[in-house]
Amino acid sequence: MSTLSFNNISTEVLSPLNQFEIRDLLSIDALGNLHISITNIGFYLTIGAFFFLVINLLSINYNRLVSNSWSISQESLYATIHSIVTSQINPRNGQIYFPFIYTLFIFILINNLIGMVPYSFASTSHFVVTFALSFTIVLGATILGFQKHGLEFFSLLVPAGCPLALLPLLVLIEFISYLARNISLGLRLAANILSGHMLLHILAGFTYNIMTSGIIFFFLGLIPLAFIIAFSGLELGIAFIQAQVFVVLTSGYIKDALDLH
């Protein structure tokens, strides 16, 4: 039994996929068949929301003349996302949807950064989270388009200057492309976070095996260790870039729904 337990532990440490496994942190059997549990993904999403509130509280100036570092950082992110939204949509309508898009950016960014902490959990590496976001956003943009334009919203599927003979084929292609937004938006975020964390896990295990093989190999292992540190910095950049790409595409989908192009 102990050997089996030892083998299970070894498999968990060496497998790069086990870090993404959803586990119950707290499980309660309530009345009847009712089962209440807190999973690691729910726990870390809650932590992300908590950090979001804390950061906003820390950025409040309380009528101080000189802004603190938290406030300056928040204002920089605010200005960046505001510029993206107003340029993608337009200055007037962009103001309406900016609070949602800014909150979406901070939510994704914080959860991406939490996933970079060792022994934590990358919530945005799970397709159930990213697809829930992407399906909701595309559905909301579609409802917005129908609410504003009615059946004229279907003109979004008709390319400008399309020959009449090719119209059925091109409309079908545009329709499939529109439906693919549900998948591509969430897939891009989860795949980038997932692949980066898997590569870091594999490189870390490889470096650990080298550095524990002897004194000579310990110094040789400093080379891949330096690469891991550099790659971790790159992953931090990817955490910001993927959050920004997500909101840029979201702004584009809202613009398509509003302007039909």
Swiss-Prot record:
Protein location: Mitochondrion inner membrane
Functional summary from the UniProt entry: Mitochondrial membrane ATP synthase (F(1)F(0) ATP synthase or Complex V) produces ATP from ADP in the presence of a proton gradient across the membrane which is generated by electron transport complexes of the respiratory chain. F-type ATPases consist of two structural domains, F(1) - containing the extramembraneous catalytic core and F(0) - containing the membrane proton channel, linked together by a central stalk and a peripheral stalk. During catalysis, ATP synthesis in the catalytic domain of F(1) is coupled via a rotary mechanism of the central stalk subunits to proton translocation.
Pfam families, A to Z: ATP-synt_A
Gene Ontology annotations of biological process type: proton motive force-driven ATP synthesis
Protein family (similarity comment): Belongs to the ATPase A chain family.
Subunit structure: F-type ATPases have 2 components, CF(1) - the catalytic core - and CF(0) - the membrane proton channel. CF(1) has five subunits: alpha(3), beta(3), gamma(1), delta(1), epsilon(1). CF(0) has three main subunits: a, b and c.
Gene3D superfamilies: ATP synthase, F0 complex, subunit A
Domain of life: Eukaryota
Biological classification of the source: Eukaryota, Fungi, Dikarya, Ascomycota, Pezizomycotina
Primary site of residence: mitochondrion
One cellular component (GO) term of this entry: proton-transporting ATP synthase complex
Membrane topology: Multi-pass membrane protein
Molecular-function annotations in GO: proton transmembrane transporter activity
Transmembrane segments: 38-58, 96-116, 126-146, 153-173, 191-211, 214-234, 235-255
Protein name: ATP synthase subunit a
Keywords, comma-separated and alphabetical: ATP synthesis, CF(0), Hydrogen ion transport, Ion transport, Membrane, Mitochondrion, Mitochondrion inner membrane, Transmembrane, Transmembrane helix, Transport
